[in-house]
Structures are given as C-alpha cells and as structure tokens.
Amino acid sequence: MMAFAPPKNTDGPKMQTKMSTWTPLNHQLLNDRVFEERRALLGKWFDKWTDSQRRRILTGLLERCSLSQQKFCCRKLQEKIPAEALDFTTKLPRVLSLYIFSFLDPRSLCRCAQVCWHWKNLAELDQLWMLKCLRFNWYINFSPTPFEQGIWKKHYIQMVKELHITKPKTPPKDGFVIADVQLVTSNSPEEKQSPLSAFRSSSSLRKKNNSGEKALPPWRSSDKHPTDIIRFNYLDNRDPMETVQQGRRKRNQMTPDFSRQSHDKKNKLQDRTRLRKAQSMMSRRNPFPLCP
C-alpha cells in the first residue's frame, strides 16, 4: 500500500479534523470540506470587521498574491465597477469613431489631435480632411503614397494661409487727390460742400470715433477658458413633460379668472340698482325737503 494513497476508512479517528488544525492534503474530498468550513468562518469574521480592518486585510492579501492573481482581481473589479471616464475610441469600432469626428469643425479637430497619440492619428486621417477640402474645391495635384499621412490636412492649412481676407482700407489723405476742383461760391443759405471738404469732414469724424476705441494687439494669445468648444448637449435638455407642465402653470397664472370677474361685475350692478331704488324711495317719501 502506498503512503500517499487515500485512506479507505474516512470516518476513522485518524481522519477527524473537527478539533484539529491538521488538513489532510492526501485526500481531496476532506481537503475541500475543510477549505469550505474555513472559508465560511473567514466570511463570518469579515462581516464583523470594521471598514478599516477590511481594508487592511485586503491590502495584505493583495500583497501576498502573485502577478497573475493580481491581474485576475483587476479583471473582476473592472467587471463589477463601471468605468467613470472611458475613451470611446478604444471601445467603439474605428468606423464609428471616424463618423463621430466627422461632425467636428477644423478647429475642434486640431484640438482633438492634442489629446493623445491615438486621437492625433484619428483626427489627422485623410478621410476627414478630404471632405473639408473638397467643400471649397481645393484639390491636390499629385497622388500621395500609402505611407504619406495627413496630406489633406496640410493642404487645408496651406490653402487657408493663402487666402487674402482683409478689411477694405481707405486711401491715405495724400494719395486721395481730386483734379480740377473749383470752389463754388454762392450767397444762398444752403451752400454746397466741395468733395475735398466733405472728405476732410468725414475723415475727421472717423478719427474722432476711432480715438475712443483701443487698438487690437498684434498677436492675441489663446484663450485659457475657450467657449467655442461648448456644444449643445442632448443630455442637458429638460424633460419635455416637465416643460409642458411648467408652461401650463404659467398660462394659468397669467390668464385671469373670467368667471370670477363676471360674478364681481354682477354683484356691483346689483348693488348699484339697489342703491338707486333706495334713493328713489327716499325722494318719494320726502318730496319737499326742509330748507335750512
């Protein structure tokens, strides 16, 4: 008989582990039974411990676990606890992520490219910038290789730089010369102004108006708290039923009670008729009032 073979008689006095700390390793059934008993006992102790004691026990158990066991605990925690801040580009398919980015304007896409390397790769794809270039009929005159990325974004930026969008400038005072100008003298009260005097008066008025305005700096730094990135969020909308109920309450408060007003008018008319009747009766009873 082998030394590590399971015993035939499991109910003998040698296999009793009720009042003993010895665990029969060579017998799997008894070992599982003892493990379940001790696990239940540990659960009862854990229920009676305070929060700080439970944290100390969990910290000690995690420190004793191996790397694979710690990874197992991490996966279990991720299943139980929902993620608070989750990157949708890592969970959604690539096609859906590009579809979401396609609704952004060029400035927002450039801001998204500064989040991380993964977002930079998505925000600079040609599938997004090609549509924005074709919208203004901006084409490229070469066929890019598969290894070249961000060609359409660079082309968009270059075309925007080449646009000459400036405000209309008034000609300088010295350059604005009217040839053969003759002053018209007339004794009439409504004298006509010459074009040169009219231009001088308009320029003086413009200078007076612009003197109060501050000149813009040559370069304005980026806003620390930008507001152009704030979009209309559907989750911020109010409940439609609640808005309808509030509108009805306001209407009821604003509209007067016509039934009550009509009742008050009837009461006033009745009081007036009674007063007139009483005055007429008094005048009949005393037709000749005594003079003082």
From Swiss-Prot:
<comment type="function">
    <text>Probably recognizes and binds to some phosphorylated proteins and promotes their ubiquitination and degradation.</text>
</comment>
<protein>
    <recommendedName>
        <fullName>F-box only protein 16</fullName>
    </recommendedName>
</protein>
<dbReference type="Pfam" id="PF12937">
    <property type="entry name" value="F-box-like"/>
</dbReference>
<dbReference type="InterPro" id="IPR036047">
    <property type="entry name" value="F-box-like_dom_sf"/>
</dbReference>
<comment type="subunit">
    <text>Part of a SCF (SKP1-cullin-F-box) protein ligase complex.</text>
</comment>
<keyword id="KW-0833">Ubl conjugation pathway</keyword>
<feature type="domain" description="F-box">
    <location>
        <begin position="86"/>
        <end position="132"/>
    </location>
</feature>
<feature type="region of interest" description="Disordered">
    <location>
        <begin position="238"/>
        <end position="292"/>
    </location>
</feature>
<dbReference type="InterPro" id="IPR001810">
    <property type="entry name" value="F-box_dom"/>
</dbReference>
<dbReference type="InterPro" id="IPR052805">
    <property type="entry name" value="GEF_Ubiquitin-Prot_Reg"/>
</dbReference>
<feature type="compositionally biased region" description="Basic and acidic residues">
    <location>
        <begin position="260"/>
        <end position="273"/>
    </location>
</feature>
<feature type="region of interest" description="Disordered">
    <location>
        <begin position="188"/>
        <end position="224"/>
    </location>
</feature>
<feature type="compositionally biased region" description="Low complexity">
    <location>
        <begin position="194"/>
        <end position="204"/>
    </location>
</feature>
